[in-house]
Swiss-Prot record:
It catalyses: a long-chain fatty aldehyde + NADP(+) + CoA = a long-chain fatty acyl-CoA + NADPH + H(+). Belongs to the LuxC family. CDD domains: ALDH_Acyl-CoA-Red_LuxC (cd07080). It comes from Photobacterium phosphoreum. This is Long-chain acyl-protein thioester reductase. InterPro entries: Ald_DH/histidinol_DH (IPR016161), Ald_DH_C (IPR016163), Ald_DH_N (IPR016162), CoA_reduct_LuxC (IPR008670). GO terms for molecular function: acyl-CoA dehydrogenase activity; long-chain-fatty-acyl-CoA reductase activity. LuxC is the fatty acid reductase enzyme responsible for synthesis of the aldehyde substrate for the luminescent reaction catalyzed by luciferase. Keywords: Luminescence, NADP, Oxidoreductase. Pathway: Lipid metabolism; fatty acid reduction for biolumincescence. Its EC number is 1.2.1.50. GO terms for biological process: bioluminescence.
Length: 488
């Protein structure tokens, strides 16, 4: 669904717009031209006709959870095929336009397949977050009521471009709760949401899930009169990104509409005097290298408790070199390379221990506690020597620190209470920062609960409660002044 045209000597990739599960005719639209990794991308700008189409869009979704999961599984099997054209195009786009290494791009496509194909996990997400996988389909008895979880309606997803899978996750959550999806892509990644929605259409263009997909782009920095109309029709908003993105979502969402905010976070690693230094270093290296530290869960600072920090430092160097081969770093801009070099020189000038990989593939700095320099990301990390957990807690910030990885795993039980009390939102084993386990929270919340509205059907007055074993005849109680007789 993505095509290209030639402008001068340059090939420009054209990104489609999808509304209601159908590619929009944008031949008369204005276009915005983006430059990604020195290549041109052309994206249609939404107009009033598009807004009216979105407003009038209403998909009757009578699917049960089994039908939803089975459809997602079918799509996931397409992504599992290495010959699926949508997958191949997606991988090429990530490499060409986003600067991913081929290995990184392939891994991203593999994860899309994994998420969609993991039927048990999809069921369990609903079960653990909503209390029952049946509550989205049936009225369930709870206490003295029957309760059902209904979709909010139109869910607007304001996606970030740094972590493609966050957008996939956002969309899957809305699908599991039977919401329509209005997806605003990021200028940094206009490919993932389109590829996912298009794969739904490839599978069955008439399916309610396919028809509930709308994918488009607008800029926060231009006239937002038309985008504001889309925001005004939202029943729930899911916002991903940095401070400016979250601020924009807050300012342009109607006051009576809930916003799920997945804003900027930082993450750290704790290495607690491991016996198996190699195993610990492998885990920490993975957590530094995955997404080149662009994700909220990416390790930026390492705190080493124990006496063998130099041995660990040397082993971590070896493992970072390994990741340079098995998961090569993505392309960097000139400014990013300059920032990387500047931090390296500053740390060397400060007499810190500094090691770096070939071609700026990674940077590791051993620095005193509290001597934090700038963080260029791009697989750069600071390691600090501490004596115990009390020296680490001042650097765990409430609402800022997301993931704390711990190695060895057994030490996490020792530290989890103090980490949680100081603001950590996730505690995971080193090497697992990118895998959000089923049943866990995301940024301190259970997102599916925010994507539904619970409707209660309460039992009649003839239904006695645990504390009052008679009919609840309120008029009679008032007439006979016997209310207190029934107080437990």
């Amino acid at each position: 669904m993505c095509n290209a045209e030639f402008k001068g000597d340059c090939m420009i990739k054209k990104i489609p717009m999808i509304i209601g599960g159908a590619e929009r005719d944008t031949s008369e639209h204005e276009y915005r031209e983006l430059t990604l990794n020195s290549y041109k991308v052309s994206i249609p700008i939404i107009n009033q006709d598009d807004v009216e189409a979105i407003k009038s869009q209403s998909v009757e979704n009578n699917l049960n959870i089994n039908q939803i999961v089975n459809f997602l599984y079918t799509v996931g099997q397409k992504w599992k095929s290495e010959n699926y054209s949508r997958r191949l195009t997606y991988i090429r786009d990530l490499v060409r336009f986003l600067g991913y290494s081929p290995e990184m791009a392939k891994l991203e496509a593999n994860w899309i397949s994994m998420i969609l194909s993991s039927k048990s996990a999809l069921y369990d997400i609903v079960e653990t977050e909503l209390g029952s996988r049946h509550i989205v389909d049936e009225w369930l008895p709870q206490g003295d009521c029957y309760v059902k979880a209904m979709p909010k309606g139109k869910s607007v997803h304001l996606l970030a471009g740094n972590v493609p899978l966050s957008g996939v996750t956002s969309i899957i959550r809305a699908i599991l709760t039977k919401n329509e999806c209005i997806i605003k892509t990021s200028s940094a990644d206009p490919f993932t949401a389109i590829a996912l929605a298009s794969s739904f259409i490839d599978t069955d263009e008439h399916h309610p899930i396919s028809r509930s997909m709308s994918v488009m782009y607008w800029s926060h920095n231009e006239d937002i009169a038309i985008p504001q109309q889309i925001m005004n029709c939202a029943d729930v908003v899911v916002s991903w990104g940095g401070y400016d993105a979250i601020k924009w979502a807050t300012e342009h969402t109607p006051v009576n509409v809930d916003i799920l905010k997945f804003g900027p976070k930082k993450s750290i690693a704790i290495v607690d005097n491991p016996v198996d230094i190699t195993a610990s270093a492998i885990g920490v290296a993975h957590d530094i290298c995955f997404y080149d530290q662009q994700a909220c869960f990416s390790t930026q600072d390492i705190y080493y408790i124990g006496d063998n920090i130099d041995a660990f430092f040397d082993e971590l160097v070896e493992q970072l070199n390994l990741y340079m081969d098995i998961l090569p770093k993505g392309d960097q801009t000139f400014d990013e390379k300059a920032s990387f070099s500047l931090i390296e020189k500053e740390c060397q000038f400060a007499k810190y221990k500094v090691e770096k990989g070939d071609n700026q593939s990674w940077l590791l700095v051993k620095s005193p506690l509290g001597s934090f320099g700038n963080q260029p990301l791009a697989r750069s990390a600071y390691i600090h020597h501490v004596s115990d957990i009390s020296e680490i807690t001042p650097y765990i910030e409430n609402r800022i620190t997301q993931t704390v990885t711990v190695t060895p795993w057994e030490s996490s039980f020792k530290y989890r209470d103090v980490l949680a009390s100081h603001g950590a939102e996730r505690i995971v084993e080193s090497g697992m920062n990118n895998i959000f386990r089923v049943g866990g929270a995301h940024d301190g919340m259970r997102p599916l609960q925010r994507l539904v509205k619970y409707i209660s059907h309460e039992r009649p007055y003839t239904y006695s409660t645990k504390d009052v074993a008679v009919k609840i005849e309120q008029t009679r109680y008032l007439e006979e002044d016997k209310f207190l007789v029934f107080v437990p």
